[in-house]
């Protein structure tokens, strides 16, 4: 999906990854991250958000819940980390990093609610009154006032499978009345997902029905005299979509893919954010006229299409296609069209969620000054593997 953008925006990353692989420093099934470029992308996002008065929570799941990288990005001015699930929150808190938003997309399990409250989480999203009551009880016990966001939805909204949740817009007034009667809670705002999506047909990011539902919910509460501090509208956050969010009065967004430049809008390599990572593998064997590289990093919604194959013997890079991958099977190996020498390097660049893969994450600094250096190795869940 992003091979052309990678070649256009960050050819130095390709060269550095292949060089480190030739030195035996990078193994197959590794996401190689250009630290300097991801920090530059992060800085551009912060600067753009400030222009439009939007606060940004840092999303880390796309780059493998990596605490080292998260700490560097937080230093740029992000308002804390959004933990999409409770295991991500655990990784970040163990690293001593501030989790600012928890509960969306995945609610906090009952026996972890108290810890989230006691740790000073800025906002906790709730989908049910039952969970709101758990947060209320934890807040009272801790002697705190806990801010919460309500996830809302309407019947015609778009929800990904496995993410069906929220309070129906038509019953929101009753829900809010219940929330306001719970001790220890402060209704800070509303959220939904996805609020923006890339439209391939028109070639740009557009608001979803979900965003309109979010706005309707805000306006409905405003008519009742309820002012909200936070209108949180995640999905497709980037330098070019932040102005659109500002038009709708959004106060908070949560960039993830924009940090690595792997947003659908950047398929041609023409966005302010530049590609900052690639996936490196190696030819394992041939079968019936095709080559198979080591797998582990495939993501079924990643739209991976093209690959670069590097043969050390002649220092040649050849472009080929990734053949159809059966999404119902484990990606032990991935099929590439044509036969290439065994143990040739393979480079792909596609949309990923590293935390659901088996990949290693290799952090590389100094690429653009011609001195690439590995500064960290992690697994896909943010655990250090040593330097």
UniProtKB/Swiss-Prot annotation:
Pfam families assigned to the protein according to its UniProt record, in alphabetical order: Ala_racemase_N, YhfX-like_C
Gene3D superfamilies named in the record: 2.40.37.30
Organism of derivation: Escherichia coli (strain K12)
Coiled-coil region: none
Annotated protein name in UniProt: Uncharacterized protein YhfX
